[in-house]
A protein has these predicted regions:
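Outer-membrane beta-barrel pore domains and translocons
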Residues: 2-6, 53-55, 91-93, 124-126, ...
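Residues that define the transmembrane beta-barrel architecture of outer-membrane proteins
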Residues: 26-32, 66-72, 102-106, 113-115, ...
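Repeated loop/turn-to-beta-strand initiation elements of outer-membrane beta-barrel proteins
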Residues: 45-48, 82-88, 116-120, 157-159
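Membrane-embedded beta-strand positions of outer-membrane beta-barrel proteins
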Residues: 1-3, 34, 50-52, 76, ...
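Surface-exposed substrate-engagement region within the catalytic domains
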Residues: 81-83, 90-115
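Outer-membrane beta-barrel "beta-signal"
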Residues: 108-117, 121, 126-128, 144-159
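Outer-membrane pore/translocation modules
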Residues: 1-67, 134-144
């Protein structure tokens, strides 16, 4: 079970145009993410994860948008060898919560493990890093060159 609370720490850029700061109150900045993560490792090479999710925004941008969004994500990892593998994730949005065109989030990645590091190169159509950003608000498709490149380095160590 995973739950997260996120707080927006940015200025409302539309305030100069309309005179109203939508982030004036602290609780307007909060969003909540809840997931039930079910995962299994099938042998040494393949792992699979299914995660139904729920996102709630205390305040949305447009009054016609819903505050609650839900869907389900699936992720996988396949290791070709002890050092090289491929990952993937797809998130399906179930309800129609906005008039804007948002798309399902999808990402693929390659990973290389060395003695103490894990290097990942990722391609995705999402912009946000946190679940409350990329699950409901992916506004690019793979078919219209809306692809983003990401890179992670992980270090494993023991105390």
């Amino acid at each position: 079970l995973f739950s997260g609370v996120y707080c927006i720490g940015m200025k409302d850029l539309a305030k100069d145009n309309n005179g109203y700061d939508k982030y004036q109150h602290f609780d307007s900045r909060l969003s909540f993410v809840h997931q039930i993560i079910v995962a299994r490792k099938f042998g040494e090479q393949f792992s699979l994860e299914i995660a139904p999710w729920f996102v709630h925004y205390n305040q949305v941008d447009v009054i016609t948008d819903l505050n609650d969004m839900y869907g389900v994500s699936a992720a996988m990892r396949f290791k070709f060898s002890k050092k090289f593998g491929v990952t993937g994730e797809y998130s399906y949005r179930i309800n129609k919560y906005s008039r804007n065109d948002y798309y399902n989030s999808m990402g693929i990645g390659l990973e290389l493990q060395t003695a103490g590091h894990i290097f990942q190169v990722l391609l995705t159509n999402s912009i946000g890093l946190a679940e409350s950003q990329y699950l409901p608000y992916t506004n690019n498709r793979w078919t219209n060159a809306g692809i983003r490149l990401g890179f992670n380095i992980g270090r494993s160590f023991q105390l």
